[in-house]
Amino acid sequence: MKIDILTLFPEMFAPLEHSIVGKAQTKGLLEINYHNFRENAEKARHVDDEPYGGGQGMLLRAQPIFDTFDKIAAKKPRVILLDPAGQQFNQSYAEDLAQEGELIFICGHYEGYDERIKTLVTDEISLGDFILTGGELAAMTIIDATVRLIPEVIGKEASHQDDSFSSGLLEYPQYTRPYEYRGMKVPDVLLSGHHENIRLWRLEQSLRKTWERRPDLLEHYQFTQEEKQLLEKIKSEGSS
């Protein structure tokens, strides 16, 4: 996958040189290029200006971003604009982006964008109902969530398929050595060696955590008969 990032602050992306995303670049599975669109700004390198009609703050001008975009977008890639008014990002969105061969991220700053910039964009994405200083942190979050889903980036595909949200449910609790720590013990079923009992325990724990913490995820979840029975058991225990 190739990713191009239009930003005023390329240095903010240093964390992408480490961990999973950094290893993906080392393996040749990922290429990330940073483009400071201030370098293409006319008018003494000014990238922002006052909004027509008045108002608070400054807007990013169209010219620097268009000129930068023209230099890098030979094809018609997926172009992502980070915007609090965009579609909310989730695991399903990450899985969709991971199928792409090329992505371009436009990271804003200041009060907002000249609306004409959005004619370049295929996706407007938000992380949630809150405001960040700029689009850089949001872009890094989306890139991390997306890149780890690219085949061969993570050693075992099952490693991310078991993650929270990948199955539609929150992930079950996990434990490692020692068996007991400060009076807290690992559930005995996990030491039993009985694979079916372990599978059922994990499924029940995932359902329980999802029902208690994110019941909204269950509204459109496609239950198996086994899952329906387990959820009814969980609900009856909760009401007893």
Curated annotation (Swiss-Prot):
Sequence similarity: Belongs to the RNA methyltransferase TrmD family.
Compartment(s): Cytoplasm
Species, as recorded: Streptococcus mutans serotype c (strain ATCC 700610 / UA159)
Disulfide bonds: none
Alphabetical UniProt keywords: Cytoplasm, Methyltransferase, S-adenosyl-L-methionine, Transferase, tRNA processing
Gene Ontology BP, a term: tRNA N1-guanine methylation
Role summary: Specifically methylates guanosine-37 in various tRNAs.
CDD domains, sorted: TrmD-like (cd18080)
Gene3D superfamilies linked to this entry: 3.40.1280.10, tRNA(m1g37)methyltransferase, domain 2
Catalysed reaction equations from the record: guanosine(37) in tRNA + S-adenosyl-L-methionine = N(1)-methylguanosine(37) in tRNA + S-adenosyl-L-homocysteine + H(+)
Entry EC no(s): 2.1.1.228
Subunit structure as annotated in this protein's UniProt entry: Homodimer.
Ligand binding (S-adenosyl-L-methionine): 108, 127-132
GO molecular function annotations of the record: tRNA (guanine(37)-N1)-methyltransferase activity
Main location: cytoplasm
Cellular component, GO annotation: cytosol
Protein name per UniProt: tRNA (guanine-N(1)-)-methyltransferase
Top-level taxon of the source organism: Bacteria
